[in-house]
C-alpha cells in the first residue's frame, strides 16, 4: 500500500510521485485504474486515469491505457504529477539566466534565494512567476502538462530543467523515474575525509519531531521513507572543510543535505541541518570570527546544481550542461583557498 504524504508543503514536494509494484500471483483480471485506486491510498481514480492519458503508467516497461487488465506478476510503474494548484501564477518581469532553450525544453541557472514554486502565502517573485513572463505569449505556465520536471531548494543555486510541451514533460519525467538523467552538485561540507570517494544509502522521510526537515529512516520503521542514494567524491581539500561533488542516483527532497549530515559532514552554512555552527577547527577568537565572516560571505547552504544530463525528448540527442558557481560560493571557496591558519592563532 502507498500513502501520499499530504503534509508536504509545495516548495519541498518532489515534482512527481513515483510508485512501483508487482501484482500478486492470485490477482484476478482488473482494470489498472481501479486496481491502482484500491492500492494507492489517497489517490483518486481520476488522477490515475490522467496519468494513463499522459502516458505515465507502464506495465512491464510499456505504456498502457487506463482500461488495461492487470495480470499476476505484472510490474506496474506510475508517475503522478501533483494535483493542479488552485491559484493563478501571474507573470513577473524577473530576469532568467537561460543556459539553453528550444521548442521542447528550457534549461536555466537558478540563483540562490529564489523560491521555485509559489505556495503558503508566497505567491510572488518565484521562478514560476518569472517563467510565466518568459512564456507569456506562447505558453501558459498554469497548464499542469508543462513546466518543472524537477526542483531544487530555495537556497540552492544551479541548473533546472523545464518542459515546454506535454510530450516533453512525460518523456523527461520517465527519465527521472528511471534514473537515466545525470545530475551532479558541488557542495562545501564541514570536516575532512580520509577517502577520496564513497556512496551514501539511506531512505528519507520527514522527521516526526520537526516536519520541516528530513532524516534517514529504516524503511521497515517508516514505510513512507523513499530510497535515496548519493555518490560523492572529493574535489578539493581545505584544513577544516572539503569541497565535494555529489552525484544523485535518486533525487529526494534535501537528499544531499541529509546524507552528508548523516555521515558527519553537514553542508557549510546549512542552518536547517546544523552547518551554521563552528563544527571543526580552532578554538581561537580569530578563527571563530573567520568562520562568521565566511557565513556572511555565503549565508546559505553551500550547494550548487553543477551539471545536468538528459536525453532530448524529441531528437533523442544526449544533452549535457554545466553551470558556473554562484558568486557568493566562488568568493567563499576562494577565501578557503587563501586560508592561512598561522594568522588565526595557529592550528
Task: Label each region the model flagged.
Residues 1-347:
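RNA pseudouridine synthases
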Amino acid at each position: 500500500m502507498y500513502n501520499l504524504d499530504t503534509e508536504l508543503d509545495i516548495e519541498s514536494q518532489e515534482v512527481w510521485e513515483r510508485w512501483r509494484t508487482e501484482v500478486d500471483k492470485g490477482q484476478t483480471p482488473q482494470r489498472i485504474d481501479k486496481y491502482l485506486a484500491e492500492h494507492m491510498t489517497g489517490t483518486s481514480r481520476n488522477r490515475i486515469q490522467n496519468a494513463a492519458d499522459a502516458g505515465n503508467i507502464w506495465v512491464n516497461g510499456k505504456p498502457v491505457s487506463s482500461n488495461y487488465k492487470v495480470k499476476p506478476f505484472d510490474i506496474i510503474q506510475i508517475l503522478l504529477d501533483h494535483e493542479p494548484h488552485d491559484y493563478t501564477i501571474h507573470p513577473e518581469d524577473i530576469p532568467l539566466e537561460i543556459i539553453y532553450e528550444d521548442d521542447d525544453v528550457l534549461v536555466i541557472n537558478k540563483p540562490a534565494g529564489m523560491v521555485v514554486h509559489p505556495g503558503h502565502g508566497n505567491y510572488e517573485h518565484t521562478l514560476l512567476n518569472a517563467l510565466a513572463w518568459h512564456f507569456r505569449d506562447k505558453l501558459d505556465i498554469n497548464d499542469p502538462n508543462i513546466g518543472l520536471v524537477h526542483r531544487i531548494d530555495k537556497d540552492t543555486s544551479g541548473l533546472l530543467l523545464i518542459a515546454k510541451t506535454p510530450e516533453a514533460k512525460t518523456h523527461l519525467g520517465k527519465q527521472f523515474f528511471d534514473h537515466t538523467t545525470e545530475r551532479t552538485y558541488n557542495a562545501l561540507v564541514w570536516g575532512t575525509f580520509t577517502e577520496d570517494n564513497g556512496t551514501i544509502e539511506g531512505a528519507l522521510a520527514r522527521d516526526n519531531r520537526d516536519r520541516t526537515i528530513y532524516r534517514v529512516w529504516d524503511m521497515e520503521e517508516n514505510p513512507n521513507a523513499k530510497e535515496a542514494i548519493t555518490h560523492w567524491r572529493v574535489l578539493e581539500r581545505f584544513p577544516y572543510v572539503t569541497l565535494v561533488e555529489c552525484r544523485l542516483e535518486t533525487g529526494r527532497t534535501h537528499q544531499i543535505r541529509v546524507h552528508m549530515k548523516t555521515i558527519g559532514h553537514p553542508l557549510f552554512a546549512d542552518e536547517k541541518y546544523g552547518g551554521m555552527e563552528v563544527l571543526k577547527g580552532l578554538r581561537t577568537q580569530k578563527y571563530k570570527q573567520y568562520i562568521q565572516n565566511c557565513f556572511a560571505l555565503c549565508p546559505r547552504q553551500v550547494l550548487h546544481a553543477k551539471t545536468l544530463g538528459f536525453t532530448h525528448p524529441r531528437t533523442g540527442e544526449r544533452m549535457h550542461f554545466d553551470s558556473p558557481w554562484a558568486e557568493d560560493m566562488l568568493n567563499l571557496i576562494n577565501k578557503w583557498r587563501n586560508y592561512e591558519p598561522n594568522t588565526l592563532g595557529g592550528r
